Amino acid sequence: MARTEYYDDPNAPKPNNMVVAASAVVTDNQGRILLQRRRDNDLWALPGGGMDLTDSLPGTAVREVKEETGLDVEITGLVGTYTDPKHVIAYTNGEVRRQFNVCFTARIIGGHLEISDESTELRFVPPPELANLPMHHTQQLRLQHFLENRERPYLG
């Protein structure tokens, strides 16, 4: 199912659903960041997705990283909360989401890289190369906040 992301766009459709989601900035021992090229919009993104009713938010991030990349991770911190109502995601099935995302930091504790049906490519990216990848504004913001090494998480 394809999707289109909107940010501060007066032509964006109105949301008909709110989804609580979690994402994770997963780094390797060289400080590179794990990204996936999404099949549904061909943009690079952090691993992440919607919370199940039986999940905690950190558990959601751990599960989504495993499902989307094959890696087992441990949550190590919090990048921030992202609840901007100007960010809307429209799916081809008619769902238009306003997303509530909590972004964590995580370290790899096992598994091996394996592309899921949600992505076409997985890559560990050195921070200076992030700007060269096609990526939605909201993903760039999470990465920027991570790279700033903030004393406190972003709350927005």
PLM-predicted stretches and their roles:
Residues 26, 103-107, 124:
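Short, well-ordered beta-strand micro-motif
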Residues 72-81:
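A short coil-to-beta-strand element that immediately follows conserved catalytic motifs
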Residues 1-23:
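Acidic, metal-coordinating catalytic segment for phosphate/diphosphate chemistry
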Residues 19, 39-41, 46, 73, ...:
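Short connector loops at helix/strand junctions that flank enzyme active sites
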Residues 42-43, 112-156:
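Nudix hydrolase/Nudix homology domain
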Residues 84-112:
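Active-site-adjacent beta-strand/loop module that shapes the phosphate/pyrophosphate-binding cleft
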Residues 28, 32-68:
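Conserved Nudix-box catalytic region and its N-terminal flanking loop in Nudix hydrolases
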